[in-house]
Amino acid sequence: MARVKRGVQARRRHKKILTLAKGYYNARRKVFRVAKQAVIKAQQYAYIGRKQKKRNFRSLWITRINAAARINGLSYSRFMNGMLKAGITLDRKVLADIAVHDAAGFAALAEKAKGALAA
């Protein structure tokens, strides 16, 4: 059997890692061993970050809805309960957008929620 030299594959593998490490400082960019560790850790952080992003945005939406609901005389939990009882099924993302960009529209929703809570 013929001898297989793996220089091409090794160079390709190294180049792939070093390309991913572009923008890092010092040895993390230049030395393959260190760059590989840095890239693996960065990918772990990126994976975790994608999960945290969902939590963070939901938290932000809830904070915005709560602030707008309190301006209209309701707490967040009572507002959401009123929305449920009124049969209004808008998700938190949309409600937060309405709260930020359309105060009058949110006030109308708050009144409907108050009415549903009173009934």
From Swiss-Prot:
Pfam entry (one): Ribosomal_L20
Gene3D superfamilies xrefs: 6.10.160.10, Ribosomal protein L20
Domain of life: Bacteria
PROSITE patterns: RIBOSOMAL_L20
GO MF annotation, one: structural constituent of ribosome
Alphabetic keyword roster: Ribonucleoprotein, Ribosomal protein, RNA-binding, rRNA-binding
A GO biological-process term: ribosomal large subunit assembly
Protein family membership: Belongs to the bacterial ribosomal protein bL20 family.
NCBIfam families in the record: rplT_bact
Record function comment: Binds directly to 23S ribosomal RNA and is necessary for the in vitro assembly process of the 50S ribosomal subunit. It is not involved in the protein synthesizing functions of that subunit.
Name this polypeptide is given: Large ribosomal subunit protein bL20
Organism: Xanthomonas campestris pv. campestris (strain B100)
